[in-house]
Amino acid sequence: MSTTDSGFVLYHYTPSKAAAIVFVVLFIIMTVIFAVQTLYAARKSSKALKNNPFESSDDKVDSLEDAEYKQLKITPTVFAFIPFFTGCIMEAVGYIGRALSSSNPERTTPYIIQSVLLLVAPALIAATIYMIFGRLLHVMRCQSLILISARFGTTFFVVGDVFSFFLQAAGGGLMSKAGSTKTGSGLITAGLFVQVIFFGFFIINEIRFTVNVKRRCLFYEDISRKWIFVNATLLLSSMLILLRSIVRIVEFIQGFNGYIISHEYFIYVFDAVPMLLVIIAFSVGSFFGNVFDVIKECQTLSN
């Protein structure tokens, strides 16, 4: 058991250095692989669309919907992955913190690094999931299939995600201060609840889209099935993060002497593994279909 001078228990065990290093390496490898895949896919699709009117800035548009549709270019979609890769890097750095803690479990700095970064990283990855789903809806012209206003659909989910992020980040910061641990834990729990609620609602919209896309997408019969792999990746990733967040909620409800926080295997089985699987799902899924291919196909068919 590792405690601070104030008596706060940092760890109920000595963190495993080997496990932490393994996940640092895995997160770095998968992040680099998927980053290369993303940039390659974006460049390939961008070249294919270079003579497409949707890539031109002086197009005449007949409606607001057309204007929004033509804004779905390749480059802005690449930017949507920035939160994803930021979250992946935070995961790796978080486990570096755990590796450092294994040598000196009483040090607060590595503890704070791993505690805060591993807590908030999934919220950044979730932001990319929301934005990619929004682009999928727009490019397939299926905005009407979600249960909120099409204009504010993506914004709604991203704002909720940002709110969750700041609640968890603030809570993580307070937990590192003597006398504020309960307040910090409460904020973290609230942030996780917000994340679960928004993810649950998001998954409902994902399923609604999947079930009804055939009758709503005007060029459904002409488009390839690459969008199915994109959608499946988003849905699987959402469920993995949802599972991870639910376990985290239980952890903080149990308190600092609870069973989950007292046993290290929970952080790996229900946090490290699900988040690594999210990156793997995106990487493997991109071989069968990525959002850039879907944008290219839909815009070509709509032209």
From Swiss-Prot:
Residues 40-76, 133-154, 205-226, 286-303 are cytoplasmic. Its main location: membrane. Residues 1-18, 98-111, 176-183, 248-264 are extracellular. Signal peptide: none annotated. Keywords: Cell membrane, Glycoprotein, Membrane, Transmembrane, Transmembrane helix. InterPro entries: RTA1. Induction: By oxygen and heme deficiency. The keyword Transcription does not apply. The chain crosses the membrane at residues 19-39, 77-97, 112-132, 155-175, 184-204, 227-247, 265-285. One of its GO terms (cellular component) is plasma membrane. N-glycosylated. It is found in: Cell membrane. GO terms for biological process: heme transmembrane transport. Involved in inducible protoporphyrin IX influx and heme efflux. This is Protoporphyrin uptake protein 1. It comes from Saccharomyces cerevisiae (strain ATCC 204508 / S288c) (Baker's yeast).
